[in-house]
């Protein structure tokens, strides 16, 4: 259990859903948080809303590209000491990535270098609809040993 922060990047950029490959930079994250009147603190879980999940609910094929966290944004969140970062998309990070020579660079920055958890396929629309930017984030522990990923059901309490 910790504090959750939702950044509505679709509203920040004025487009929903955001286009594939749109990367959230450190400057974008700072500006979006300021615009929403929230701060990101050590120990927070930060979720991003791009409109990706809602726009793709009725599709039968996985869309190959998506908006998401960029490398400077990932480094910024890690420097702040967040516990986890998540988004309403299947990979959290922008695809195609900013650097086409690296596979999933944001995953490498957050998970491998800084130990920041990644949350994918987060349902953020209800929080956006209610205008929520801050909430209590509750996440149970899956009863799996030795796994590197799991299906979880987090709860946002407003």
Task: For each feature predicted by the language model, list its residue ranges.
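Active-/binding-site microenvironments in catalytic and ligand-binding cores
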Residues: 1-158
């Amino acid at each position: 259990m910790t504090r959750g922060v939702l950044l509505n990047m679709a509203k920040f950029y004025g487009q929903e859903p955001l286009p594939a490959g749109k990367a959230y930079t450190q400057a974008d994250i700072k500006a979006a948080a300021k615009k929403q009147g929230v701060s990101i603190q050590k120990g927070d879980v930060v979720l991003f809303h791009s409109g990706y999940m809602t726009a793709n609910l009725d599709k039968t094929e996985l869309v190959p590209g998506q908006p998401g966290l960029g490398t400077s944004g990932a480094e910024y969140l890690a420097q702040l000491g967040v516990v986890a970062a998540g988004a309403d998309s299947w990979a959290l990070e922008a695809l195609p990535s900013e650097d086409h020579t690296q596979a999933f660079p944001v995953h490498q920055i957050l998970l491998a270098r800084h130990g920041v958890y990644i949350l994918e396929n987060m349902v953020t629309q209800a929080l956006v609809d209610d205008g929520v930017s801050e909430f209590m984030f509750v996440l149970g522990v899956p009863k799996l040993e030795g796994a590197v990923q799991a299906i979880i059901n987090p709860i946002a309490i407003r």
